[in-house]
Regions:
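Alpha-helix initiation/capping motif
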Residues: 3, 7, 56-57, 81, ...
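Active-site-adjacent helix/loop patches that line small-molecule binding or acyl-intermediate pockets
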Residues: 33-38, 42, 51-128, 136, ...
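Short, glycine/proline-biased beta-turn/loop segments that scaffold the active-site neighborhood
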Residues: 5-61, 134-154
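Short glycine/serine/threonine-biased micro-segments
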Residues: 9, 18, 58, 108, ...
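Short helix/strand-bridging catalytic loops that position acidic/His residues to coordinate divalent metals
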Residues: 1-8, 106-109
Length: 203
């Protein structure tokens, strides 16, 4: 099953998570980051790593909003380097994109492999206020008599089962979804992704 089993490099589709972590670490969409050549030592007997932007151009100081909208590789690497690759790897693991990601700066450009299911599940957090919504394949299972023996619903409606309710408060629905980042970050990244379509690489 290519959606659940096939491993693929997400490439630039991973970048929103780099910028989400940046926003969680005191960056703002208007924070300036230098879009300029980066040369990194990979270790003994290995060539220097020189990531490049598409088109092999660079544009100087730019906002991280622009960095995401235009999918700038050099800016993304610099952001990941400033935040710390250990934090980025841990963040990606918490989002369940990767099980045990290597702490390499190249993962900021989506070099590590994952499945489409894991990636789309992580994307759901942007439109759900920073909560990770794990996909389900079975909604519920009932026996021959209509009794529910399995229900995937993770939300709980308080006081919904009461026969009569005379209080002033309306019943509240609480969920058990994992909070992976703030609602503010979710809102800002969603806005930045809209910019990808309006002004950036998705135009």
């Amino acid at each position: 099953n290519r959606a659940t089993q096939a491993l693929r490099q997400p490439g630039s589709a991973f970048k929103p998570f780099v910028y989400a972590l940046a926003l969680e670490n005191k960056f703002t969409p208007s924070t300036l980051v230098l879009d300029a050549p980066v040369v990194l030592d990979q270790g003994e007997d290995l060539k220097m790593w020189k990531p490049e932007n598409y088109g092999k151009k660079f544009y100087g100081p730019s906002t991280i909003r622009t960095g995401l909208e235009k999918s700038r590789n050099l800016m993304t690497v610099r952001v990941a380097q400033e935040i710390g690759i250990d934090k980025l790897a841990s963040f990606a693991k918490n989002l369940k994109i990767y099980d045990n990601p290597e702490e390499l700066l190249s993962i900021s450009l989506g070099s590590a492999e994952t499945t489409l299911l894991k990636l789309t599940s992580a994307y759901s957090s942007f439109v759900n206020g920073g909560k990770l919504i794990e996909p389900i394949f079975l909604d519920r299972i009932q026996d021959s008599e209509g009794n529910t023996i399995f229900n995937s619903e993770k939300r709980v409606c308080e006081k919904c089962k009461e026969i009569s309710y005379l209080g002033d408060d309306v019943p509240k629905i609480k969920d058990k979804f994992k909070k992976v980042f703030s609602e503010e970050t979710a809102y800002q990244i969603t806005s930045m992704l809209e910019g990808v379509i309006k002004r950036g690489t998705g135009k």
